[in-house]
Curated annotation (Swiss-Prot):
GO biological process entries: photosynthesis, light reaction
Pfam annotation, one family: LHC
Domain of life: Bacteria
Species per Swiss-Prot/TrEMBL record: Rhodospirillum rubrum (strain ATCC 11170 / ATH 1.1.1 / DSM 467 / LMG 4362 / NCIMB 8255 / S1)
Transmembrane segments: 23-45
Cytoplasmic side: 3-22
Family as reported in the entry's similarity comment: Belongs to the antenna complex beta subunit family.
An annotated Gene Ontology molecular function: electron transporter, transferring electrons within the cyclic electron transport pathway of photosynthesis activity
Name of protein: Light-harvesting protein B-870 beta chain
Chain residues in the propeptide: 1-2, 57-69
Length: 69
């Protein structure tokens, strides 16, 4: 009898699938790393969770900048 060769639904070989998976996982890790770094920079610039005094610290900064200009 003839041996039945299993073929994937996508039509790519196992080696090609492993290569694609390697590139995909490294790309997604780089994307998440850049996104986390961007969120960190935005957090340093303007935190989205208020401190113990609320956003009053930002009001003082606004008044100071208005006075200086």
């Amino acid at each position: 009898m003839a041996e039945v060769k299993q073929e994937s639904l996508s039509g790519i070989t196992e080696g090609e699938a492993k290569e694609f998976h390697k590139i995909f996982t490294s790309s997604i890790l780089v994307f998440f790393g850049v996104a986390a770094f961007a969120h960190l920079l935005v957090w340093i610039w303007r935190p989205w969770v208020p401190g113990p005094n609320g956003y009053s610290a930002l009001e003082t900064l606004t008044q100071t900048l208005t006075y200086l200009s």
